[in-house]
Amino acid sequence: RFHQSNREYELIDWIHEAGRLRAQGQLAGLVLNAGAYTHTSVALADAVKGTGVTLIELHISNVHAREPFRHHSYLSAVARAVMCGFGVAGYGLAIDALAQMQ
């Protein structure tokens, strides 16, 4: 299943849905590119932590080679893994990695 939204509340709702699916054994985990919310959203991190969902935090670019404010992530502390800098190919790599974690 794939979702895209620029609305933080929708991302939180989908994380909560993922938690329900995980509890039912229907979900391996999430690959999340939260964009700028990575650096600002305690709410997204709390949602992941509260659901216990396995998370791979994904960034298309190498955020550590960008502006200093992008070097901090609220999600990294609740993510099983962090991937960055692979371009859009990172999505496939992250899904493969998620499958290997199970």
Which stretches of residues belong to each language-model region?
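Short, well-structured alpha-helical segments in soluble
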Residues: D13-G25
